[in-house]
Amino acid sequence: MQAGQTTPSDAAEVGGPERDLARLIDSYLTTQLLYVAARLGVADALADGPRTGREIATSVGADPDVLTRVLRGLVLDDVLAEEDDGRFALTALGERLRDGVPGSLRGAALARGELYWSAAAGLLQAVTEGGTAFEHVHGEPFFARLAADPEREAAFQASMADRAQREAADVVAAYGFPGIGDLVDVGGGSGVLLDAILRATPELRGVLVDRPEAVERARARLGAAGLDGRSECVEGDFFATVPPGADAYLLSRVIHDWDDADARRILTTCRAAMPAGARLLLVEAIVPERAHDGPEAVRMDLHMLILLGARERTEAQFRDLLAGAGFDLRRVVPTGSAAGLSVLEATVTSAAR
């Protein structure tokens, strides 16, 4: 290092803007510390109370000295607490790294620390040359990579299910799904949102359409909830066809996975299946005009850019996208969710019938 140069750690000692920027630069540590903790099951090892680093290491199969250093890093981010006797304990943040607890983010930590992490290295190339960051790094599309790697596919799906679980109640409470007898959940994943809708609206029947592996998980979830009599899970390709004749077609966090051309193809497929008077319901984050007015939507937009070359959209962009597929945007219902989701309700334009 040349004279006069400083490392981020040196800058952190200075204070002020240098310190704050140094913390941002060092944030790469946080992602990987959380990933290691999630991967090893550190939070679950602390579920019964505080333990020493050595005790945790024995429980999760790790090197005691190295793991203890990782645990201290997590203390700095308030994920763990370090007690006077040197034992470590879960904080409210750390509790959300446990597997299967309400509000769990373990799946997100696993996904961010693996595929998202590696794909981000391709962002500069995507910005300067075009294309998708993920494909620059891995040489194939994101979903193709997942399909070839069952372990990472499981981690990603766990992340999606955790997220859907956190958001479903807000969506149902905000929109209510009134006047709908039959609903098709297009790309409904593991069925978390359809489960919540069916529980809240006893008069409604639902059909979930997705890939075979998702359908299997959804069928198991809805069956365990006793909702199999009011639901059906079918394999399908939403670029080709969806079940016709329903009162409403729901696409939750689907359209943001695709660029405008592919998104329009999906919407056109739905339009072809919709009878007169049917509703199209999109559950999506709406990008605000100014970043600080919707930080979660802005962050998700960057995830979509890096992984898929796709995007979150402003309300005006949604309106244009829907119009291009033969829909009128009728209303936007904010859900109040932490992710800033809204339900966009649209109907087929008279000219498109």
Regions found by a protein language model. Give the residues of each.
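Conserved Class I S-adenosyl-L-methionine-dependent methyltransferase catalytic core
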Residues: A11, E18-R39, D44-P50, T58-S59, ...
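Alpha-helical subdomain
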Residues: Q2-E82, F177-P178, D182-R353
